[in-house]
Amino acid sequence: MKLFHILAFSGLLLFSANDSFAQKRTYECNPINPEYQAMADNVVKFAMEDPDAAEKAYTKLTKKIGKSTDDLLSVGTYFLEQNYIQGAMMYSKMLYEKAPEDINVLMYCGEVRMKMQDWGNAGQMFDAVLSYDPNNVEALKRNAFVYKNVNPHVAIDALQKIKELDPTYFKADKDLGDIHYKLDKYKDAVGYYENYYKAVPKDTINLDIRSCENFLQSLYSQANFDRMLEVSKEVLPLAPKDMVLLRMDFFAKVNKMGEALDYDGAVKAATDAAAYIYNNEFADSLYLYLDYEYAAVLEKEKGNIPAAISFYEKALAKDSSKLSGYKELSALYARNKQAALGIKTFNTYLEKLGDKADLSDRFLLATKYMAAYQQEDTPEAEKAEYYQKAGEIFREVIEKKPDYVQAYIFLARLSNVDSSKPLVEVRDLYKKVLEVSEPNKEKFENYRFEACRYIFFYDVSIEPADIEDAKKICEIAKSIRPDDDFVKNAETYLKQMAQ
């Protein structure tokens, strides 16, 4: 047998460094015989240096032990605790053949396979223990760990049983929270994490920071921003450079700005929390689309449109599939008097939207062209193109949906190229606004009032003035805003004309 020669090529196969589950002894085992310990130390020593010597030392030790189950278990445990996984595995096979119903042997065999990350066989060993002793808490704990990534429902059952047997074992709630988090059952995860968080001491030794990350992200999914802030305030001092904790604290503070009594203070708190983004405290690859989107939202709230644009550009560079980002960026470009970029970005949004684009999207595109046309620094040649494009799309929308009130109002505004004189085309469009908005007067009352103002101006400006229509329009306007100066002035004018 040249097993040592084969495995010596890879230290990872000889010595385990798997600390995914902090292993402590979960079974009864006699102290190792000092003579056997010295011989075992030789096996471990030679394993990486001299495979032939290691094999001889191993054979000598095993012969010396003979058939004693207790000594095989104590030496195997010594190998396991020295992270000499090959020796531990070989002893586990011998022990399982000798005593397949011994709970201590089964627990040992399960521990060895856990070290090897052989989760399936580890689970079988712990299942065997539970078939003999259903209330074996240590086997239940190991089973929960083994199965939580491969068969979470088995793990959940084990953890619930542990809670029944040992209500003080708060780690069961942590594990239940982790499992439900991975199953995207965030509401359930929050409940378990709350139980864990209330019970665990808040220090770096006892508190599991990764589970706190999951706890905060579960709270975020439930929009529980108040609780997020409470938790992050306690946990961040324990892990001040944890990116997930910083992220969740920042997101919560941005979401709380709108309802803060001290708005300026809330904005400052959010700005301070965004330092991990502003100061590039982490490698760029670690930032998410949402990091930059939230930073953009914050800068937009502060009125810093160029900075908001920059962050949205970074966000979309991270994830170009986020369609809402293109839509928002397009609007920001327009606000920043970069109408051409706004149009280009919105067209990208429409291309990515594909068949899901609807008339409202086409309408918004027309408003982008209209904004570009109205932008003062747009070259005249481009103005003409933008004017034509906007008009074409507004008319296209109206043709497909004749009761699209907003399309009429915007086309009327676009067509009002000379505000000093009445234009019949504009009057007709505003008449359509009143007509198509009739079924929803309250919803469109601002548009209706705007239409009344123009139509009244038209009626009294033409020769001869259309006083009868002007009276009707004045009454409509009065029904919307009876105390408005326009209504009062219109009534005064009509009275004078009647004299």
Task: Go through the PLM ranges and name each one.
Residues M48, E81-Q82, K115-M116, F145-V150, ...:
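Register position in tetratricopeptide repeats
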Residues K60-L61, M94-L95, A128-V129, K161-I162, ...:
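Canonical positions in the second alpha-helix
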Residues V43-V44, T77, E111, F145, ...:
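Residue-level recognition of tetratricopeptide repeat
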Residues D71, V105, A139, A172, ...:
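TPR alpha-solenoid repeat register
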Residues K2-F9, S20-K93, E97-N104, Q124-D127, ...:
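N-terminal leader/linker segments that initiate helical-solenoid repeat arrays
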Residues G66-K67, P100, P134, P167, ...:
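Short coil turns that delineate tetratricopeptide repeat
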Residues S74-Y78, Y108-E111, R142-F145, D175, ...:
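Canonical tetratricopeptide repeat
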